[in-house]
Each structure stands twice: as structure tokens, then as C-alpha cells.
């Protein structure tokens, strides 16, 4: 019995002598790198290429989806702003046709106010001083406001006069309370003797007041949030030239997936959009992990 165990042990020891160790195996691979490397590349390279192409395709689709959603909301915002701002042209036309006679302002302003949603108030500013407001309730504090002698309003008011076109001021805090945009259309009437010597035919302004929360509501920006996207509406401040966040997640503009321009008559706004969800779904991540495992065990 003892002799049989000895023979068995000797056989195992003899077999162990002939079995290569892990270190010996690795050394053999290194010595034969010219054979191992091509084999490794044959296994790894196709999988790496397929994985890269797959990820690129997913990210491209992800970017296209974000672009489509963001552009839709940017278009809605543009159209609503354009509609509301252009109301100042209609109001100015009423003054010009009547040669500065503003009798009937309230009746005409009420029609505009009720037919074009999103407007908070319509104003006339004869000689650049607010003289008529509809609706007056809630806006009484703005009556008599001298735009050309207000440090916060003067610059954009003079831009409107000198250009002869609609300008958009704000958003800023109002004297009567609230945060709003104001579209100003300068009105010029032949033979009118203006108080501003360099603009002798300048009658005043036709103004449209648009509350900023209404701009955001009508622009449907809350839809972006509901669909899983973060956004930032921003501009370069006309006085400082520095970026100013108007709404949304401040700082998102630094590295958004998509960005869109909102052109106003005398300003440019930007809408930055970034999805909150990952580019790759759980199933896609599983697929990529599987490919990686195949590479490792090839």
C-alpha cells in the first residue's frame, strides 16, 4: 500500500515538472508577440469598431432629438414674441393715421388687447411721457413716466427714435410692479413740432407691455421641463455686455447640447437646451458592457 502511494506521488511530481507555470506561459506569449499581437487585434479591433460606431450612432440620434425638441420651443417663443411685439406697429398706425389725434384710444386698444393674447398693457407716450394706458387698472404708477429722463429707459428709447423702428427694452422691473418687456414703436407725424430738436417730427411712442412670466408661459418653455430637458434663456446685457440669465437653469449656457437664437428687433436672445436623461438607455449600456466582455475574453 505504501509502495502504491509512493508511486502515485512520484507520478504527480513528475507531471508537475512538465506543466508550464503561469509565468512561463506569459513569457512564451511575450517571446511570440509577433503571433499573439495580430491574434489580439483580430479579436479586439472589430468589436472596438462596432462599439464605437454604435455609441456614435446613439449620440447622433440623441443630439438630433434634442435639436428637434429645442428648435420647436424656440420657434414657438419666436412666433409669440413677434406677434406681441408687432402690436406696437398697429397701435402706432392708429396715431399716425389720425395725425396725432388719439380720441378713441381706449376702444381701439381694448380690441387689440382682447384679440392678441399675452399683452399686459398698451400705452401711448406723447413727447415720450406716458399719457394713455389700457387697461389703466394696476398700471396707474406708470402714468406720466418720462422715458427720456429715466436713466434705465433713456438709452433704448433714443435707439428707437434714431432708428425709427420698434425696439424691445427689458426685461426689467416696472414702476407699477412686475417684470416685463416693453416694445416701443416711435411715432413721427409731419408738421408736428417735437420737444426734441434733433427729431422735429417725433410725436412719441406706441408701447406694448408684455409681462415676462407670460412670455415664458406662452413660449411653452415649461414643456421642455416636462419632457425631461433643462434650459436656460439668456442674453448679453445691452449695458454691460456680460451674459445675463433670463430664465431657467443659470449657467447651462456654458456647455449645452443644443443652442438656439431668438432674434428680437434690436437684440438677440439664446435658448440653451440640455437633456436630463442619459444618452444611453439601460439596455444600450448592457449591450456595450457585453461587447466589452467579449473583447476581454476573446
Regions found by a protein language model. Name each.
Residues 8-21, 258-278:
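Juxtamembrane amphipathic/hinge helix adjacent to a transmembrane helix
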Residues 29-33, 58, 76, 152, ...:
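Non-transmembrane, amphipathic alpha-helical segments
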Residues 39-100:
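Juxtamembrane extracytoplasmic/periplasmic/luminal helical "stalk" adjacent to the first N-terminal
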Residues 63, 67, 71, 96-270:
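Intrinsically disordered, low-complexity polar/acidic regions
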Amino acid at each position: 500500500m505504501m509502495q502504491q502511494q509512493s508511486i502515485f506521488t512520484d507520478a504527480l511530481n513528475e507531471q508537475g515538472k512538465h506543466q508550464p507555470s503561469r509565468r512561463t506561459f506569459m513569457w512564451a506569449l511575450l517571446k511570440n508577440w509577433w503571433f499573439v499581437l495580430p491574434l489580439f487585434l483580430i479579436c479586439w479591433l472589430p468589436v472596438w469598431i462596432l462599439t464605437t460606431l454604435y455609441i456614435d450612432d446613439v449620440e447622433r440620434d440623441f443630439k438630433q432629438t434634442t435639436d428637434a425638441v429645442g428648435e420647436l420651443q424656440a420657434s414657438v417663443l419666436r412666433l409669440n414674441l413677434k406677434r406681441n411685439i408687432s402690436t406696437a406697429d398697429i397701435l402706432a398706425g392708429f396715431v399716425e393715421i389720425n395725425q396725432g389725434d388719439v380720441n378713441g384710444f381706449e376702444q381701439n386698444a381694448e380690441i387689440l388687447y382682447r384679440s392678441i393674447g399675452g399683452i399686459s398693457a398698451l400705452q401711448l407716450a406723447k413727447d415720450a411721457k406716458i399719457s394713455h394706458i389700457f387697461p389703466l387698472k394696476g398700471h396707474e404708477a406708470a402714468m406720466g413716466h418720462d422715458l427720456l429722463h429715466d436713466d434705465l429707459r433713456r438709452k433704448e428709447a433714443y435707439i428707437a427714435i434714431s432708428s425709427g423702428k420698434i425696439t424691445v427694452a427689458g426685461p426689467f422691473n416696472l414702476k407699477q410692479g412686475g417684470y416685463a418687456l416693453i416694445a416701443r414703436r416711435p411715432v413721427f407725424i409731419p408738421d408736428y413740432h417735437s420737444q426734441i430738436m434733433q427729431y422735429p417730427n417725433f410725436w412719441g411712442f406706441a408701447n406694448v407691455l408684455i409681462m415676462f412670466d407670460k412670455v415664458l408661459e406662452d413660449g411653452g418653455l415649461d414643456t421642455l421641463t416636462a419632457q425631461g430637458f433643462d434650459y436656460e434663456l439668456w442674453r448679453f446685457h445691452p449695458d454691460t455686455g456680460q451674459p445675463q440669465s433670463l430664465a431657467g437653469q443659470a449657467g447651462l449656457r456654458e456647455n449645452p447640447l443644443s443652442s438656439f437664437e431668438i432674434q428680437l428687433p434690436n437684440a438677440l436672445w439664446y435658448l440653451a437646451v440640455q437633456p436630463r436623461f442619459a444618452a444611453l438607455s439601460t439596455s444600450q449600456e448592457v449591450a456595450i458592457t457585453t461587447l466589452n466582455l467579449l473583447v476581454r475574453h476573446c
